[in-house]
Amino acid sequence: MSDYSKVSFQNNGKLKLLIIVGTRPEIIRLAAVIKKTRKYFDVILAHTGQNYDYTLNGVFFHDLELADPEVYLNAVGSDLGETMGNIIAESYKLMAAIKPDAVLVLGDTNSCLSVIGAKRLHIPIFHMEAGNRCKDECLPEETNRRIVDIISDVNMAYSEHARRYLADTGLPKERTYVTGSPMAEVLHMNLAKIEASDIHARLGLEKGKYILLSAHREENIDTEKNFTSLFTAINKMAEKYDMPILYSCHPRSRNRLAASGFELDKRVIQHEPLGFHDYNCLQMNAFAVVSDSGTLPEESSFFTSVGHPFPAVCIRTSTERPEALDKGCFVLAGIDEKSLLQAVDTAVQINLDGDDGLPVPDYVDENVSTKVVKIIQSYTGVVNKMVWRKG
């Protein structure tokens, strides 16, 4: 049984905030928020231990200059069911021990299921990236989104699209806010280091003469039909464009490829997951970026806004960020050969023609961390009084 008796807040009179993360995307998106909340609140950062590999975890704390988490929950189990159960159980024990005034989570990963324990302990819950919907039940994240949105006391959405989804669910409008995406703030804080990266020299790549690939989503990697279709299409892409395809390959994707015996085209170069500065430097100088990452639309919008647009192709059949399609920031490709090659051709030619789309208005604010601090400070007491009848 885990013992959290030695974990404690500083008790310095400030609001005691517990932030829970578990994966690389959460760490990246919350980077500016974590720094800002540490300035104004008494903060404990807890990591569930889901992405325990250094390339998926530690490198981002280093790149983004974040202090290590105060506590690791070590929730990874022998299978998904055990891991989810451990996340709920361990986060409950931690919250019962340290008694935070509020809990903050972001997104739709399994680490967000920690809000179940917070609800039972009557702790106000604040949820960033609320209201995202892709309407595709094959995505495990879609289930998590609904659960976390419903349980949370205050939902902070990226866009008006997401706010409408929350309203349609019947959630209280008076406790739903559009803060915008936190990515512009994080990227702008790191832009000088991104531009200064020497990753091209280290990898021997010529700017504009390679395709950057990221494919790691469960529905693309773990489903046999989708896996075969996607990587067959990737091989055809390598053959057609005859240039290096740098694959930022997560451990689970690498293991899946090895177990399947699938033979990648020799021009597809598997590389361990790249750090934040290196990856974004590669993105802004690529012939095209082909990715199933949820942050692709936000990154494309940001780099367009600072004069570094790149052809962005999303290898999915749905998106929870329709506001980025509204502004022409990326192309949805699907995972079959014909759709992928057509999408890459289209995105590249549009970029060459100088028609780069427009930055998404909800993705350009660089004070999202300040908004989050003020919302948490404003509503912790309100939730305690109006929801839990405290005081």
Model-based region annotation:
Residues 1-243, 253-391:
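Nucleotide-activated sugar donor-binding and catalytic core shared by glycosyltransferases
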